[in-house]
Amino acid sequence: MITPQDACYLRVCLKLKAYDALAASDGILAAPAMDVAPALDATDFLLRCYYGGRALLALRRYPEAARWFQNALSAPATALSAIAVAAYKKYALATLLADAVADASTFSAPAKKYSTSRECDAYASLLAAAKKRDAAKELADVVERHEATYELDGNAGLVALVRDRAVAAKARSLAKTYSTLRLGDFASAIGFSDVEAAER
C-alpha cells in the first residue's frame, strides 16, 4: 500500500546513505500504484515517485528509476511543481544511464512538457546530444557548457557517469568496427586530446 510515509522513509535512507535499507525496502519500491492509502495526496505521490526514483538510482537500477521519475512527470497537474522539475532532471539522467530513449510524449499535458523542458534546458540538451551520431563528443560539449548547472543541481556525479558511459560505448563501437585502428586515431575518434588520455 502506498502511504504518505513512504517518501519520508526513502528520503531518510538516501540522506543517511543507508543503501542496505533501500535494498531491503523492496516492499515500498514494488508496491502497486493502485493500492493507495486514503490519506495520500498529490504531493505525497510526487515525492514518493521522486525519492523512489532516487533510491533506485542509488541501487543502480536505472530502467526502474526512469519509470518512477516518469510516473512523477505524468501525474495530472495544472501547474508545474518543483518536484516535477527535479524529477525531469533525474529522469533525463536515468534514461541515459539505462540506455533508453527518453519519451516525453507520455507526459500528461503539452504545457507541462514544454515548461519542464524549458526549465531544464541543460538536461534537454543532454538528451538531444545522446541521440546524435557522435554522442560521446556531443555529450562532452554539453557537459562542459552546462557544468555549473549540473553542479548546482547536485547531479554532477550522474552527469559524469553518463559522459563516461558514452565514451565507453563509443570505444566498444570502434573496437567492433576497426580491429586494427591506431591508438592516435582511436583517441581522436573518441574525443580525447592525446594518446596518453586514451591509454588511461
Where are these regions (language model features)?
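Flexible helix-coil transition and linker loops at the boundaries of alpha-helical arrays
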Residues: 1, 32-40, 77-79
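Charged/polar interaction segments and conserved charged motifs
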Residues: 1-16, 98-99, 103-112
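Alpha-helix boundary/capping segments in eukaryotic regulatory proteins
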Residues: 1-3, 16-23, 38-43, 60-63
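Hydrophobic, well-ordered secondary-structure segments
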Residues: 3-10, 22, 26, 45, ...
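Tandem amphipathic alpha-helical repeat scaffolds
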Residues: 7-17, 51-55, 93
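Helix-turn-helix repeat elements of alpha-solenoid scaffolds
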Residues: 14-32, 64-70
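Alpha-helical scaffold segments of alpha-solenoid architecture
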Residues: 23, 44-199
